[in-house]
Amino acid sequence: MSGEQQLDADLGSGVEVEEFSWEDYLEETGSTTVPYASFKHVDIRLQNGFAPGMKLEVALKNDPETYWVATIITACEQLLLLRYEGYGEDRKADFWCDIRKAGLYPIGWCQQNKKTLEAPEGIRDKVSDWNAFLQQTLIGACGPPVSLLEGLRNGRNPLDLIAPGSKLECQDFRDSLSTWLVTVVENIGGRLKLRYEGLESRDGFEHWLYYLDPFLHHIGWAAQQGCDLQPPLAIKHLKSEADWQEILAKVKEEEPLPSYLFKDKQVIGTHEFSINMKLEAVDPWSPFGISPATIAKVFDDKYFLVEMDDLRPEDHTRRSFVCHANSPGIFPVQWSLKNGLHINPPPGFRSQDFDWADYLKQCGAEAAPQKCFPQSISEHQFKENMKLEAVNPLFPEEVCIATVTAVRGSYLWLQLEGSKKPVPEFIVSAESMNIFPLGWCETNGHPLSTPRRARGHKLRKIAVVQPEKQILSSRTVHEGLKNQLNSTHSVMINGKYCCPKIYFNHRCFSGPYLNKGRIAELPQCVGPGNCVLVLREVLTLLINAAYKPSRVLRELQLDKDSVWHGCGEVLKAKYKGKSYRATVEIVRTADRVTEFCRQTCIKLECCPNLFGPRMVLDTCSENCSVLTKTKYTHYYGKKKNKRIGRPPGGHSNLSCALKKSSKRRKRRKNIFVHKKKRSSASVDNTPVGSPQGSGGEDEEDADDGDEDSLTEGSTSEQQEELQEESEVSEKKSSSSSPTQSETPTPLPPDTQTNKRDAQTSSVSDDENKPPSPKEIRIEVDERLHLDSNPLKWSVADVVRFIRSTDCAPLARIFLDQEIDGQALLLLTLPTVQECMDLKLGPAIKLCHHIERIKFAFYEQFAN
């Protein structure tokens, strides 16, 4: 596998996308949405066929077997406000009902089905003769269509009656205006996928229309208008005339959809256009600009054919479309100029600049007068930078997020975001039925194409490039990441609250609180997305990557002297079976993210570049590779305060008495020291313990246990060497370390005792008290003879030793956490369990080998 393929595999694995959230997206981009009321066609769909004043028979609430006549007061989507007849203007007994659940029946249903029709108890004594009252009340009354009520009782909304397989009539709006039958393939929220009757999907003549489109009608409309049903010219040649007539006869036998479903369609008025009039138009098949056009044909007083001008030879296909007086996308001459827009000259136009006066003279035509065009709608709520959902004009089956980039009168310029293929900015009318409000797709179960950045802003799982897989050169990795970022750059929108990608630079110094191995397992980056959401996720990951999550949470918790003025977020940490919570302040705006990340790193005493918007490849600008992570532990003994480690400038002295720690301990301070070259002189000059910065701040939190020091930063040569060795099976590793040899030479009994008393151990609480010398006994035949001082061992030396033991599978942990000889000698059972996440059994086995090294160290090199 090539480097690029490996990179793609690593970066592309494990990506899981959550649902798109409009609320989060609007906050991230700092934008607003078009008001719901701006989409009249959607609002009409929700009117459901019921209207105030309609009367029906409804079951009484306290007696479902008894019914009474009620009047619709208000209709709101699927809810009706009803009032029983007899209450007059009294509203106290008005009640709401769900049209899909309530028992609603047409007037006369009770009589036909022998059901009891009786007034409610509250008004029963108000009228002496209810039959006469009803006869008088129901004179001239109207009710909902019977088919509508029957559909509701079957659990269907009015619009659901237009089900797949339903038949409609559709006018051909491309060139001929011929009317033919279409079959509904899909109905998604009133948006219909249609196929010409008699054809199959493979024939490729499917198209999408909204059910209120003026060219779509119920069965029987053509006959009412005196038109013949004829297949469009584009498909007429596919079958014989006899076949078409046979198809027509079959459809006439089927029960048609109720015509009331289309009662809210736009009424087509008469026009005043004449043949050869010139105008400006938007080509509906390519709505990316405005061009000159001509009235090519007038069908009748309602419809006419507009043809886009084309000055090329006659063999070019002419693009045309049928219009009516209120059709969108047609404008009077000079409309573009008056609105500050560019008009695209017709194909074949030779001059550089297009001028309407010269063009009309050249064509010998006249401009269509202003009175022929509908009045522009000036009152609408569309504004620039607002968000909505819109149909892709090139791929009508796709609905995308769209941004209003410009508004001219009643026309909008939209830019799609997240479309499968790039689509230029296009023009639609503010009354277009191909645009929808926020959440329309989610409400109706229609797929919504969203920007790549938006799709990934809440990733549960992000591609992680593990350290052992980074065999590629840094240049290859960098180029791969650069290409990945560039691929999404075009669809990114920077907003005030949009946080950039936050990178975890695991090669940087991780400080005393964070586990370097766990940081290396974190995602390479989080985001982009909402600042609060991204930074909350980053801090949560860091807390979980700590030796003691509760301690890091305490370091991050909200400070009363904070200067960020952000928002407080409650974060959680779990440690030793206990849960901790604290309020942490997080910045809200993108301009403060970089400094927030830097200051948080400083607070955690790690490299300022450990995480942030900047990705560190090879060399950190802070030169953090020379820092080591060494801790100085102070605690209270029973008799006096003792210090662990060597005195300043003294010889190596790792001994401390194994005394029981008190419940109340001093807080340990951590300082950074520069890493010395590992020479014989460095042992004396680089103390394992130093009084510098050792603190006196008391601490009572039970979660602040002892953490052993892990030295940061092995050289790149060591890293490469160990990467190669890691491919070798642990089982085949040598039984002896290159730095050791077994020896049966016993120690004198008194020497043995003294050495055991001098073993190094971090003092922990009572539960995790390290094992006493009696618990870990070094047998005579297990003693080591070390060829070199373990205090000077590099990470590679430590890993080689571990691989030579029966704890070889744990060598990876030592490599990941870069534990060198100094750190190895400081390890104890509690810290091995806590810092390496080992269970008691493996931890004891590992500590057994560590104690052997310590014992050999005291015997051979301590003096």
Swiss-Prot record:
GO terms (BP aspect): cell differentiation; chromatin organization; negative regulation of DNA-templated transcription; negative regulation of muscle organ development; spermatogenesis
Chain positions found as Phosphoserine: 764, 772
Tagged with keyword Transmembrane helix: no
Biased composition (Acidic residues): 696-710, 718-727
Compartmental location: Nucleus
Subunit organization: Interacts with MYOD1. Component of the SLC (SFMBT1-LSD1-CoREST) corepressor complex, which also contains KDM1A/LSD1 and RCOR1/CoREST. Interacts with KDM1A/LSD1 and RCOR1/CoREST. Interacts with MYOD1. Interacts with L3MBTL3.
Role played: Histone-binding protein, which is part of various corepressor complexes. Mediates the recruitment of corepressor complexes to target genes, followed by chromatin compaction and repression of transcription. Plays a role during myogenesis: required for the maintenance of undifferentiated states of myogenic progenitor cells via interaction with MYOD1. Interaction with MYOD1 leads to the recruitment of associated corepressors and silencing of MYOD1 target genes. Part of the SLC complex in germ cells, where it may play a role during spermatogenesis.
Name of the featured protein: Scm-like with four MBT domains protein 1
Organism field: Mus musculus (Mouse)
Gene: Sfmbt1
